[in-house]
């Protein structure tokens, strides 16, 4: 089975306009928008648009009622059907008093479970691995801003490739388009790059081969020795 997915790189600061534009220009199975794309002030109008367009969306959401806590929402034809709260925060986010989520878990979608790593969480293999225990059809990495420099871009995409390889699953990522280096990427379940866009805005469409994500040719999960990993939780 193949899933047609759009990875959105919208201009930051005008989410309703960007939402209308991207939804009207493309017809796919699943739309993915970056971290903080919607917030408490734009959510109601966005839900109406998504309902009218009859679309299925995974988007970043900034909960202004909870000090800007970052979440991911799964929206089916204008209805929020699941959500996940960012669990691993940057030093800057903690200094601002943001609260982390209490459970690392996949979100449920009509296509199957999907693990959504919110921005900085890509740096922690434990997050993707915990999500992979739920046998997701793919991983998604929604990013707030773009990359600040070429080195960060190289590091970030290398980490994404590693997450794909070690979990034998597709991973898709996207950021906003602003002054930094915006990007959209896709790595397949063996770590081969199927999409890499930098310094471009808009919606980028790929076909995710779910059979490849399900194959688990090596199946690293079966070779884990969890009792030896206890030190990670100390």
Predicted regions and their residues:
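CN hydrolase (nitrilase-like) catalytic-core segments centered on the catalytic cysteine
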Residues: 43-59, 125-203
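Active-site metal-binding loops of divalent metal-dependent hydrolases
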Residues: 10, 36-37, 121-122, 144-145, ...
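Active-site donor-binding loop signature of nucleotide-sugar glycosyltransferases
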Residues: 10, 85-86, 109, 199, ...
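Long hydrophobic alpha-helical segments typical of transmembrane helices together
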Residues: 186-234
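Cys-nucleophile CN-hydrolase/nitrilase-fold catalytic domain and related Cys-dependent amidase chemistry
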Residues: 13-83, 146-165
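Conserved hydrophobic/aromatic beta-strand scaffold that supports enzyme active sites
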Residues: 72-74, 83, 104-106, 173, ...
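Active-site-proximal beta-strand elements of phosphoester/diester hydrolases
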Residues: 1-12, 32, 112-121, 140
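Active-site catalytic loop in hydrolytic enzyme cores
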Residues: 67-134, 147-158, 212-230
């Amino acid at each position: 089975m193949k899933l047609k997915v759009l990875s959105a790189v919208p201009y930051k600061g005008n989410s309703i306009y960007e939402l209308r534009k991207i939804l009207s220009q493309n017809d796919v199975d699943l739309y993915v928008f970056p971290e903080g794309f919607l917030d408490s002030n734009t959510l109601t109008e966005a839900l109406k648009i998504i309902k009218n367009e009859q679309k299925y969306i995974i988007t970043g959401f900034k909960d202004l009622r909870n000090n800007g806590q970052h979440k991911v929402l799964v929206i089916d034809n204008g209805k929020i059907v699941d959500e996940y709260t960012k669990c691993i925060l940057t030093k800057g986010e903690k200094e601002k008093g943001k609260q982390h989520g209490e459970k690392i878990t996949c979100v449920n979608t009509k296509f199957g479970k999907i693990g959504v790593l919110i921005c900085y969480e890509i740096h922690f293999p434990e997050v993707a691995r915990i999500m992979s225990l739920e046998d997701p059809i793919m991983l998604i990495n929604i990013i707030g801003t773009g990359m600040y420099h070429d080195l960060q871009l190289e590091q970030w995409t290398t980490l994404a490739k590693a997450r794909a390889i070690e979990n034998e699953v597709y991973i898709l990522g996207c950021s906003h388009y602003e002054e930094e280096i915006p990007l959209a990427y896709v790595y397949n379940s063996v770590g081969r790059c199927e999409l890499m866009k930098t310094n471009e805005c808009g919606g980028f469409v790929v076909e995710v081969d779910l059979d490849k994500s399900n194959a688990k040719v090596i199946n690293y999960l079966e070779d884990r020795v969890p009792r030896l990993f206890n030190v990670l939780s100390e």
